[in-house]
């Protein structure tokens, strides 16, 4: 989060897990605690599965994506990302991961993979 908020402004990032429910359960609580401790402000729009984060005069959007099956790549198609986190990537279809990687076309974008379990 610090990397995204200090290197980019007005960009879009992806936070991905097998399901959006698992993302909200496993990733977002710790991330919110970290953001609060760092002085970041987050406004979540749960109905549209994203949050806008502000820090030091910068603002970026973080979309939530679930990669549970072969239909999931269509959910992330078409968006231009400056970075993406794939939680439990080993549980996601390869086609979803490939689409997420392909979406990271902003100069300097990065990928993070967690292969647990």
Stretch-by-stretch model annotation:
Residues 1-117:
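Phosphate/NTP-binding elements of NTP-utilizing enzymes
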């Amino acid at each position: 989060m610090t990397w995204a908020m200090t290197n980019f402004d007005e960009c879009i990032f992806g936070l991905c897990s097998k399901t959006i429910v698992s993302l909200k359960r496993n990733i977002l609580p710790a991330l919110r605690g970290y953001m609060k401790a760092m002085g970041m402000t987050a406004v979540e729009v749960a109905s549209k599965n994203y949050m806008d984060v502000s820090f030091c005069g910068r603002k970026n959007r973080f979309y939530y994506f679930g990669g549970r099956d072969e239909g999931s790549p269509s959910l992330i198609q078409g968006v231009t990302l400056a970075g993406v986190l794939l939680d439990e990537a080993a549980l996601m279809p390869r086609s979803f991961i490939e689409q997420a990687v392909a979406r990271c076309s902003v100069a300097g974008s990065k990928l993070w993979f967690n292969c647990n379990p």
